[in-house]
């Protein structure tokens, strides 16, 4: 039965033997385990198997039983995600088998939000087959197969919808199951689904060895790429990524905004990647006690408690807290209630960078203490050049992950990034010795054990001063006093300080993805006045991961996986709407739509 359901209609395993990556879209939420087992049993299997399973939130209520005799089912159960909407990427067999769960209120609507190139679809017919089949045609690769259970009155409408969308049906008219292959005789879509970057070799240059660059290097190396990682410092994680600790948590707000959905995706994916590093015996210096966020006002606390209930977030994701509850969690009196993230906390950014590079060391070459003054493309290869004009490294793919300098190297329209100075303060260990968990709100306070306590941070826009200022320390103390009013912090408890510079955009979203070809866009500006992101010309092989602001820990792993997926032509791990919100070309796109640039 399983053989006929998941393999024979799609000519598996023969078809995945002819490709490096095979993508199977499953709308029945039942194909993953049989496919994984068959892939494991096949010595001629593809390098990577992607299964994208689409379902409603209710599907997460029933994880595979840990009592199941199948070891694969038990492994899937251990990796089962939290019960929250959105996309969850689970990785098995050293990342060679990937399950992306796309969870929404309506499975068919969720399908339309994805961005991928599918080799096979497995689904049930619906009472709106035209919309469903248009989505299938939007994502179908050459020769993609469809197997649909379409019995009774659903059969003929489904067959007609498939045929009108460019599929050839091979099933007999009386069959309950429709089998079809994508073979359009006319153009059935505006944009082609994603293809791998046309690289002559699986080699990349990454500029910047902070959280962004180390994460990108690791995700590419994990796919078999050889990466040259360049940084101006002697060691990785020296700028903002060199802070003693950083806090990590998603945004939760009254509506499930783009920012809330993006930070949720980044937070959950980061937890998985960090756990994989810790399972490989890397110490990330991650705090175990969760993270407490203090509301700005009592009204905000009340509104957020209502939103948490309305979205039915599980308690392992976020919990509303009264002032009394929050004080108990923190171990000290807090000013107001708020919300608690049991899986949030603090972590060492430098330890994360070190672990990622160590885990992928065989495929990463470091070029430290090296300044990149310009980059160039000869139509095939990207090259990075030093201050004397010498070539540092070259490769078909380049990723700019060097914060403020990325926009300069790429020559992005309108200088879309700004620098924000942040000064943090390290206090004596006695200052916050009663604090049990990191607390954020107007500022942040992170217990560091014997290393003291970290508080901060100032937010000084366009301030280039690298010197530590007494006024900055006092501002940080004042911020913490507003959250933790019973603590009597004093300047004499200051042990040290540090200044780093955040890179931010005007919309406070990061820049993640392939960069636009701005010269071509300027030349074709009249034709692009009504463009969408997929309409824009792109720089072949050039990507960006920068402008992470204060959320580098949440953005970095998400950015790395999204960029690696774009380079490899794999399914994206977030909805296309969310990817558009962080697209580095979004400012150019707005300017084109508003007629602000032309062919002058």
Regions found by a protein language model. Give the residues of each.
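C-terminal catalytic lobe of FAD-dependent flavoproteins
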Residues: 490-600
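S-adenosyl-L-methionine
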Residues: 64-112
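A short glycine-rich, Lys/Arg-flanked "PGG" loop and its adjoining helix->strand segment in the class I
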Residues: 130-142
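Short beta-strand to alpha-helix junction loop
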Residues: 147-149, 258-266, 294-300, 339-358, ...
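Active-site substrate-recognition segment that forms the wall
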Residues: 177-178, 187-223, 232-233, 237-252, ...
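Helix-loop-beta segment of a Rossmann-like dinucleotide-binding subdomain
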Residues: 70, 254, 283-293, 317-359, ...
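Dinucleotide-binding Rossmann-like beta1-alpha1 core, especially the glycine-rich loop
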Residues: 246-329
């Amino acid at each position: 039965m399983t053989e006929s359901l998941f393999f024979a209609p799609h000519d598996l395993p023969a078809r995945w033997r002819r490709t490096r990556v095979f993508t199977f879209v499953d709308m029945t939420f039942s194909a993953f385990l049989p496919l994984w087992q068959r892939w494991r049993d096949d010595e001629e299997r593809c390098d990577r198997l992607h299964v994208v399973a689409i379902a409603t939130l209710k599907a997460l209520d029933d994880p595979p039983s840990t009592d199941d005799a199948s070891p694969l089912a038990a492994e899937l159960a251990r990796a089962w995600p939290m019960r929250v909407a959105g996309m969850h990427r689970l990785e098995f067999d050293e990342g060679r088998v990937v399950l992306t769960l796309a969870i929404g209120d309506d499975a068919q609507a969720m399908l339309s939000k994805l961005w991928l190139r599918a080799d096979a679809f497995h689904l049930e017919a619906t009472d709106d087959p035209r919309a469903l089949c248009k989505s299938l045609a939007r994502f179908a690769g050459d020769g993609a197969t469809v197997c649909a259970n379409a019995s009774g009155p659903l059969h003929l409408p489904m067959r007609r919808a498939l045929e009108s969308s460019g599929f050839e049906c091979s099933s007999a008219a009386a069959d309950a199951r429709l089998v079809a292959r994508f073979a359009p005789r006319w153009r059935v879509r505006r944009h082609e689904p994603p293809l791998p970057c046309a690289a002559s070799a699986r080699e990349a240059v990454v500029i910047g060895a902070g959280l962004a660059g180390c994460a990108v290097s690791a995700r590419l190396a994990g796919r078999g790429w050889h990466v040259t990682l360049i940084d101006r410092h002697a060691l990785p994680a020296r700028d903002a990524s060199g802070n003693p600790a950083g806090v990590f948590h998603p945004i939760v707000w009254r509506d499930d905004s783009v920012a809330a959905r993006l930070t949720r995706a980044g937070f959950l994916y980061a937890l998985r990647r960090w756990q994989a590093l810790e399972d490989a015996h890397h110490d990330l210096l991650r705090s175990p006690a969760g993270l407490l966020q203090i509301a700005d006002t009592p009204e905000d606390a009340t509104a957020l408690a209502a939103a948490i209930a309305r979205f039915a977030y599980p308690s392992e994701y976020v919990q509303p807290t009264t002032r009394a509850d929050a004080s108990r969690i923190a171990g000290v009196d807090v000013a107001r209630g708020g919300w608690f993230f049991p899986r949030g906390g603090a972590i060492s950014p430098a330890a994360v960078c070190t672990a990622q590079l160590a885990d992928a060391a065989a495929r990463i070459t470091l070029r430290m203490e090296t300044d990149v003054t310009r980059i160039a493309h000869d139509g095939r290869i990207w090259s990075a050049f030093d201050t004397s004009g010498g070539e540092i490294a070259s490769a078909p793919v380049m990723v700019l992950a060097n914060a403020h300098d990325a926009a300069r190297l790429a020559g992005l329209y309108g200088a879309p990034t700004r620098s924000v100075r942040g000064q943090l303060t390290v206090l004596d260990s006695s200052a916050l010795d009663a604090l049990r968990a990191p607390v954020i709100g107007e500022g942040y306070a992170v217990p560091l054990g014997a290393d003291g306590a970290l508080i901060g941070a100032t937010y000084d826009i366009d301030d280039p001063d690298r010197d530590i200022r007494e006024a900055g320390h006092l501002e940080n103390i004042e911020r913490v006093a507003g959250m933790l009013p019973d603590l009597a912090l004093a300047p004499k408890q200051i042990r040290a300080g540090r200044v780093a510079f955040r890179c931010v955009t005007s919309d406070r979203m990061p820049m993640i993805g392939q960069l636009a070809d701005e010269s071509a866009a300027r030349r074709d500006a009249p034709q692009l006045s009504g463009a969408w992101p997929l309409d824009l010309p792109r720089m072949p092989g050039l990507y960006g991961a920068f402008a992470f602001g204060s959320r580098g820990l949440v953005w970095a792993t998400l950015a790395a996986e999204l960029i690696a997926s774009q380079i490899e032509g794999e399914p994206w791990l977030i909805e296309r709407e969310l990817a558009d919100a962080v697209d580095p070309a979004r400012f150019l796109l707005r300017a084109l739509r508003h007629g602000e640039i032309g062919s002058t």
